Each structure stands twice: as structure tokens, then as C-alpha cells.
Amino acid sequence: IIEFLNMRVPTGDVNRKNLNLHHAVNITDAFMRAVERGEQWDLRDPNDNDVRESMPARTLWQQILEVRYRTGEQYLNFIDTANRALPHTMKAKGLKIHGSNLCNEIHLPTSEDRTAVCCLSSVNLEKYEEWKDSTLIRDLTRFLDNVLQFFIDNAGDEISRARYSATQERSLGL
């Protein structure tokens, strides 16, 4: 996690940097409780869940906040909060959010069968007065849905999990 946190900090080994990746860190309720209580926090290998190191949770939290202060990133993804807010229809299917997209705008469930897919666009709210009475939002929504349908119709078998998710959810973001 420490290397992940520091990959956007401009100092240090250039081979360990990725200044163009805009990423989030999952923050759990358990971690925040450990911060509040001044407890140790185990750093686990995501591949085998083995503890690789332990450190004070407050020290890790301070590092997260210092990197955010210096770089504006990484985004904080309060993952347990996201799962509590998951629609009941998705909870009933046993679905769970494991992360967000890189910039943390969307929270969609993922599993062995699904890879989150969402077609995103944006509008310039500074120009709201120019388009507020137009069909812009409807047209953009239709456009995004058409892009999603094009993806579904043309996605290869190597990304079948993404195609399945797009078909099941039709997630759009504007």
C-alpha cells in the first residue's frame, strides 16, 4: 500500500511512478475504527491475504492524507459505506462492490462473473443557461446508451464478463 500511495508523488525512483493514473484507495470501517482507537493495522498481500507488515493505523492514515495533500490524490473510497448504499435489488442477488472506477465516480458490483462497465460523459454546468431548456440531457443519455449497446454487440469473448455486466445493468453516468 505504501508504494501504491506514493506512485504519484513526483520524487523518488522514476520506475516506481505513475503520474497519470488517478486512483482510489478503499477505506473500510474497520480501518477507520483502528485509526480512532490507535490500533495496529495489518498490511496484507492482496494475492494470498498473508500479513506482510503491521503498522499503526494512524501512521498509515497520516500517510494517506499527506499524499492527498501533496498530490490531490488518491481518492478515498469508503467501501463499506458504498456497499451499505447498494440498491436492495443488487444486494438480493448477492452482489457486492469491491472497488470503484479509477476516479471514484461510479460504484458497481463486481464478481467472478462481472466486470463493472459504465459509459460516462459530462456537461459543462457553467453553460447551464445555454442548454437548460434543450434536449441535451436526453440526447446525451440516448447517445451513452447507444455507445453501451455498441459495446455489447461488439465485445469479444475475452471480455465476456464486462459484456455480461453491461447487458445486466446498462450503467450510464452523466
Predicted segments with their positions:
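Core structural elements
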Residues: 143-153, 163-174
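Long hydrophobic segments that form regular secondary structure
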Residues: 130-138
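A generic short alpha-helical patch detector that favors 3-5-residue windows
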Residues: 112-115, 136, 169
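Active-site cavity-forming subdomains of large catalytic enzyme subunits
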Residues: 1-130, 157-164
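Short coil-to-beta-strand
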Residues: 115-119, 142, 172
